[in-house]
C-alpha cells in the first residue's frame, strides 16, 4: 500500500469520525424546552426529602476575591451567580465568564443546607431559612489571604445556625461550614446536603454546539464514589432514573467544556449521592450526609467543600481524589492525559503553547521514526513487486481465490508485509484524535495565543492561513511520493486530497492544524532521509513521477 492510498484511508477515517460526532448530536435531542421557574421548583416522588426547592425571595449579597465573583441569596444561602475573573467570556471580551447563573431563561445554582427532622431547610413545604448578614458586600483585600462570609439564622426555639463561606486567594475551592448551637431543650437531628441545580436546556447564548464539525464535549452530571472513580450521569440518565448510592467520600459534579462545579463532602463520612428531575426543565445532583444529633446545649460543625471554576487538573486532584478526571478527554483519555502532561512539561520551559505543540510533534514523530522507515521500506518493496503482480493477474485472470493465494505466497517468498505501510497510520490516528480532544478540553489551552494572527489555539484559524499551509505541505508530500496507482478514478481522488483535507481543516482548532503542518514538514525531511537509504539498497529511484 503506498503513501497516497494511506492519505485516502486517513481521510475516510477522519470523515467517519466527524459523521459519528454529528450523529451523536443529532440522535441525542435535548428535552422539550420549558419555561424555567427560578424560585418554586420542588422535587417530587421519593427524592422529595433530598432535592431542595428554589431559593425564593431574599437579599442578594456580593462576594469578590482575586479569582471569583459570587452572588449569594440570603434565602437559603445559595450561590446564584459565579463569575470567573481570570477567564473572559469570549476572546478579547471585557466580560468575565459566568459559570453559575440565575435568570428567567437559565438556572445554574450551587445549593446547600440542613435538612432532617429539625433542619431549617424543609423541602417538603418549600421552607428555606432567611439568613442575616453583617454587610451586603465582601471583598478580599490586598494582603488578605482568606475571606469569610457568615450568614446567621436563629430558629424559633433559639438555636443558632451560622453558615460560613470560606474563600481563599487564588483558589476556586470554597469551604462551606455550618456551626450549630442547640439552645433548645430537645435534641436536634440534622442532615447536611449540597446539590447543584441546572436547567437541562441551554439558552442560545450558552449553546456552543452548533458546529457539527466541532468536538461535542460532555455537559451534564458526574460523580465519584468508593466503587467508581469517575462516572458520567447525563441529564437523560437523571430523567430516566434517579441516582441513589451510598458511599464514603467521593464527590458530585456538573460538567461542561473547560469548567465544572462540584460538591465534595467530608472524605471520612458516609453520604448518599442522589439526582432528581425537579420539573420546569431543571435537574439536580447532590449529596446528603448521615443524620447528626446535637444534644441541648451542645455545639457542632458540619462542613463540605464546593469547587466552582476551571478544570485545572493538578488543583482539582489536590481537592479530592479523581476530581481531575472531570476533564473530558473522551474515549482516548489514556492517550490525551499523558500527552497533556508532556505538553504542560514542555510549556514550563518554552512558555508558549504553540511552540510546545511544535516540540511535542517532533518528539512524537521522532519516536515513530523506526515505524515510518519500516513503512517506506515496505512500500518500496511493494512497488518492486508490481511487475510480478501484474504478470500474475494476466496469467490467472478472474480467479480471485487463486490470485489471493499466489499473492500471499509471493509476499512470503519476498519477505514483504502488505500491511506494513498501515502501521504508522494506525498509530498516528489515535494520537491525532487524542490531541484534538486535548485541545478542546484542556482549559489551559482556551484562548491560548501562538504568534501573529493566532490568538486562540483551541479555535479555528480566523483567516484560514494554517489550513492552506497544511494543504500545501500535503501537496508537496504527494508530489514527492512514488505511486503505483494506475486507476484513473483513484488518481483523480489523490489529486484532490490536499484540497479535501484543506476544506476539512478550515474548522479545526488552530493548534491541531499546527500539529499537522509540522508533522507534514517532518514527513518531508524523513522522506528524503529514508529515500537516500533506500537508493543505496536499490529499493528506490529518484526518477520524477509521471
From Swiss-Prot:
Its main location: membrane. GO terms for cellular component: plasma membrane. Pfam families: 60KD_IMP, YidC_periplas. Keywords: Cell inner membrane, Cell membrane, Chaperone, Membrane, Protein transport, Transmembrane, Transmembrane helix, Transport. Residues 30-44 have a biased composition (Low complexity). One of its GO terms (biological process) is protein transport. CDD domains: 5TM_YidC_Alb3, EcYidC-like_peri. The chain crosses the membrane at residues 6-26, 344-364, 419-439, 457-477, 498-518. The keyword Cell wall biogenesis/degradation does not apply. GO terms for molecular function: membrane insertase activity. InterPro entries: Membr_insert_YidC, Membr_insert_YidC_N, YidC/ALB3/OXA1/COX18, YidC/Oxa/ALB_C, YidC_ALB_C, YidC_periplasmic_sf. Residues 30-55 are annotated as: Disordered. It is found in: Cell inner membrane. Interacts with the Sec translocase complex via SecD. Specifically interacts with transmembrane segments of nascent integral membrane proteins during membrane integration. Required for the insertion and/or proper folding and/or complex formation of integral membrane proteins into the membrane. Involved in integration of membrane proteins that insert both dependently and independently of the Sec translocase complex, as well as at least some lipoproteins. Aids folding of multispanning membrane proteins. Belongs to the OXA1/ALB3/YidC family. Type 1 subfamily. This is Membrane protein insertase YidC. The lineage of its organism: Bacteria, Pseudomonadati, Pseudomonadota, Gammaproteobacteria, Enterobacterales. The gene is yidC.
Amino acid at each position: 500500500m503506498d503513501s497516497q492510498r494511506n492519505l485516502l484511508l486517513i481521510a475516510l477515517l477522519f470523515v467517519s469520525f466527524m459523521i459519528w460526532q454529528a450523529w451523536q448530536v443529532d440522535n441525542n435531542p435535548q428535552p422539550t424546552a420549558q419555561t424555567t421557574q427560578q424560585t418554586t421548583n420542588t422535587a417530587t416522588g421519593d427524592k422529595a426529602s433530598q432535592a431542595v426547592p428554589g431559593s425564593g425571595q431574599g437579599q442578594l449579597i456580593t462576594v469578590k476575591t482575586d479569582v471569583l465573583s459570587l452572588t449569594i441569596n440570603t434565602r437559603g444561602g445559595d450561590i446564584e451567580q459565579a463569575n470567573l475573573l481570570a477567564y473572559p467570556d469570549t476572546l478579547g471580551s471585557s466580560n468575565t465568564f459566568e459559570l453559575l447563573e440565575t435568570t428567567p431563561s437559565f438556572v445554574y445554582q450551587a445549593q446547600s443546607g440542613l435538612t432532617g427532622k429539625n433542619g431549617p431547610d424543609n423541602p417538603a413545604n418549600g421552607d428555606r431559612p432567611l439568613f442575616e448578614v453583617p454587610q451586603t458586600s465582601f471583598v478580599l483585600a490586598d494582603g488578605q489571604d482568606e475571606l469569610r462570609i457568615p450568614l446567621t439564622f436563629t430558629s424559633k426555639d433559639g438555636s443558632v445556625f451560622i453558615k460560613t463561606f470560606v474563600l481563599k486567594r487564588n483558589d476556586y475551592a470554597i469551604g462551606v461550614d455550618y456551626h450549630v448551637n442547640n439552645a433548645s431543650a430537645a435534641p436536634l437531628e440534622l442532615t447536611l446536603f449540597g446539590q447543584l441545580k441546572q436547567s437541562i436546556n441551554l439558552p442560545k447564548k450558552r449553546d456552543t454546539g452548533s458546529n457539527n464539525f466541532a468536538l461535542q464535549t460532555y455537559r451534564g452530571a458526574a460523580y465519584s464514589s468508593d466503587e467508581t472513580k469517575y462516572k458520567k450521569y447525563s441529564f437523560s440518565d437523571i430523567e430516566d432514573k434517579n441516582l441513589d448510592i451510598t458511599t464514603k467520600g467521593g464527590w458530585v459534579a456538573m460538567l461542561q467544556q473547560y469548567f465544572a462545579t462540584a460538591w465534595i463532602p467530608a472524605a471520612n463520612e458516609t453520604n448518599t449521592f442522589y439526582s432528581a428531575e425537579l420539573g420546569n426543565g431543571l435537574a439536580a445532583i447532590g449529596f446528603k450526609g448521615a443524620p447528626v444529633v446535637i444534644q441541648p446545649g451542645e455545639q457542632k460543625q458540619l462542613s463540605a467543600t464546593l469547587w466552582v471554576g476551571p478544570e485545572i487538573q493538578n488543583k482539582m486532584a489536590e481537592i479530592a481524589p479523581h476530581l481531575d478526571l472531570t476533564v473530558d478527554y473522551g474515549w482516548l483519555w489514556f492517550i490525551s492525559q499523558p500527552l497533556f502532561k508532556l505538553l504542560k512539561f514542555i510549556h514550563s520551559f518554552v512558555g508558549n503553547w504553540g511552540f510546545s505543540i511544535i516540540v511535542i510533534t517532533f518528539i512524537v514523530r521522532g519516536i515513530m521514526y523506526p515505524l515510518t522507515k519500516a513503512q517506506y521500506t515496505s512500500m518500496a518493496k511493494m512497488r518492486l513487486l508490481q511487475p510480478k503482480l501484474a504478470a500474475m493477474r494476466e496469467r490467472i485472470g478472474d480467479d480471485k481465490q487463486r490470485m489471493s493465494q499466489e499473492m500471499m505466497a509471493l509476499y512470503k517468498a519476498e519477505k514483504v508485509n502488505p500491511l506494513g505501510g498501515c502501521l504508522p497510520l494506525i498509530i498516528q490516528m489515535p494520537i491525532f484524535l487524542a490531541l484534538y480532544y486535548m485541545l478542546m478540553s484542556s482549559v489551559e489551552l482556551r484562548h491560548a495565543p501562538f504568534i501573529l494572527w493566532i490568538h486562540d489555539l483551541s479555535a479555528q484559524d480566523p483567516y484560514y492561513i494554517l489550513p492552506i499551509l497544511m494543504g500545501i505541505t500535503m501537496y508537496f508530500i504527494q508530489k514527492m511520493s512514488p505511486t503505483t496507482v494506475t486507476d484513473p478514478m483513484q488518481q483523480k481522488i489523490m489529486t484532490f486530497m490536499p484540497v479535501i483535507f484543506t476544506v476539512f481543516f478550515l474548522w479545526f482548532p488552530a493548534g491541531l492544524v499546527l500539529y499537522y503542518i509540522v508533522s507534514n514538514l517532518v514527513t518531508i525531511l524523513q522522506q528524503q532521509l529514508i529515500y537516500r537509504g533506500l537508493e543505496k539498497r536499490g529499493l528506490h529511484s529518484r526518477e520524477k513521477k509521471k
